[in-house]
Amino acid sequence: MTTNHLTDPALSPQDHEDWQCFVTLLQQAFAENLQHPILQLLLTPDERTALATRVRIIKELMSGKMSQRELKNELGVGIATITRGSNSLKFASNDVKAWLEQQLLK
């Protein structure tokens, strides 16, 4: 698989360092079965809902069963939200897409 921690050009060096700290903290939380309380502490209910919606968007786009417009209507989100998910998928590596397929399209 490709490197898991590529530098994100959209982030400043400090933001990248902070992001890596967050990812490391989450990895440790999952290792110690503390993921739910840590995510509830760090994310607002709206942020948790937005992340869950983003996963659903990625899943539905990968399955190809609905058009972007149908997905927008089903989820009650803006077309720009669907487009961001679609654009993210376009730039994901083949390894990441294959992993997502295994996880989301079982």
Curated annotation (Swiss-Prot):
InterPro entries, sorted: Trp_repress, Trp_repress_bac, Trp_repressor/repl_initiator, TrpR-like_sf
Organism superkingdom: Bacteria
Molecular function via GO: DNA-binding transcription factor activity; sequence-specific DNA binding
Localization terms from the record: Cytoplasm
GO process annotations (BP): negative regulation of DNA-templated transcription
Keywords of this entry: Cytoplasm, DNA-binding, Repressor, Transcription, Transcription regulation
DNA-binding region residue numbers: 68-91
GO terms for cellular component: cytoplasm
Assembly and oligomerization: Homodimer.
Family: Belongs to the TrpR family.
Task of the protein: This protein is an aporepressor. When complexed with L-tryptophan it binds the operator region of the trp operon (5'-ACTAGT-'3') and prevents the initiation of transcription. The complex also regulates trp repressor biosynthesis by binding to its regulatory region.
Protein name stated in the entry: Trp operon repressor
Gene: trpR
